Amino acid sequence: MFSLQDVITTTKTTLAAMPKGYLPKWLLFISIVSVFNSIQTYVSGLELTRKVYERKPTETTHLSARTFGTWTFISCVIRFYGAMYLNEPHIFELVFMSYMVALFHFGSELLIFRTCKLGKGFMGPLVVSTTSLVWMYKQREYYTGVAW
């Protein structure tokens, strides 16, 4: 069993091994938040997921919420690896593509399928995916040594 001191020491060591700069810390933060978002889709019903798809909330079912939670958790794992190994070009590109998929999903739900509207449930994913994409686009060469 791990003691609290073991957890603290491991956490400090892990954080020290991360690439320098704020982008890896951002990716780690988003990854951690995504874990809680994933869990809530399994345990708290439909209320929070329906806030994202606010224009047509009845189209959100328990199954679609859990599927969304699973997808969010997979994205969380990808972004965690990105936080730890952002200097690796393949990992960087995988994280970047995960945000492109997220932006495409939410953009299509807003503009094509019309299940979302610009409310507070939708703005979080929109701001996170857009901010992350722009930031990563501008910082690729810094972290990977490879220009676009």
From Swiss-Prot:
Main location: endoplasmic reticulum
Cytoplasmic topological domain: 1-25, 114-120
Transmembrane spans: 26-46, 93-113, 121-136
Top-rank lineage group of the source organism: Eukaryota
GO cellular component: endoplasmic reticulum; endoplasmic reticulum membrane
GO biological process, one term: ergosterol biosynthetic process
Topology term for the membrane: Multi-pass membrane protein
Transmembrane is among the record's keywords: yes
Spans within the Lumenal topological domain: 47-92, 137-148
UniProt keyword terms in alphabetical order: Endoplasmic reticulum, Lipid biosynthesis, Lipid metabolism, Membrane, Steroid biosynthesis, Steroid metabolism, Sterol biosynthesis, Sterol metabolism, Transmembrane, Transmembrane helix
Xref: InterPro entries: Erg28
Subcellular location field: Endoplasmic reticulum membrane
Function: Part of the third module of ergosterol biosynthesis pathway that includes the late steps of the pathway. The third module or late pathway involves the ergosterol synthesis itself through consecutive reactions that mainly occur in the endoplasmic reticulum (ER) membrane. Firstly, the squalene synthase ERG9 catalyzes the condensation of 2 farnesyl pyrophosphate moieties to form squalene, which is the precursor of all steroids.
PANTHER family cross-referenced by the UniProt entry: ERGOSTEROL BIOSYNTHETIC PROTEIN 28 HOMOLOG, ERGOSTEROL BIOSYNTHETIC PROTEIN 28-RELATED
Family according to the record: Belongs to the ERG28 family.
Miscellaneous comment text of the record: Present with 377 molecules/cell in log phase SD medium.
Subunit structure: Heterotetramer of ERG25, ERG26, ERG27 and ERG28. ERG28 acts as a scaffold to tether ERG27 and other 4,4-demethylation-related enzymes, forming a demethylation enzyme complex, in the endoplasmic reticulum. Interacts with ERG25, ERG26 and ERG27. Also interacts with ERG1, ERG3, ERG5, ERG6 and ERG11.
Protein name: Ergosterol biosynthetic protein 28
Organism of origin: Saccharomyces cerevisiae (strain ATCC 204508 / S288c) (Baker's yeast)
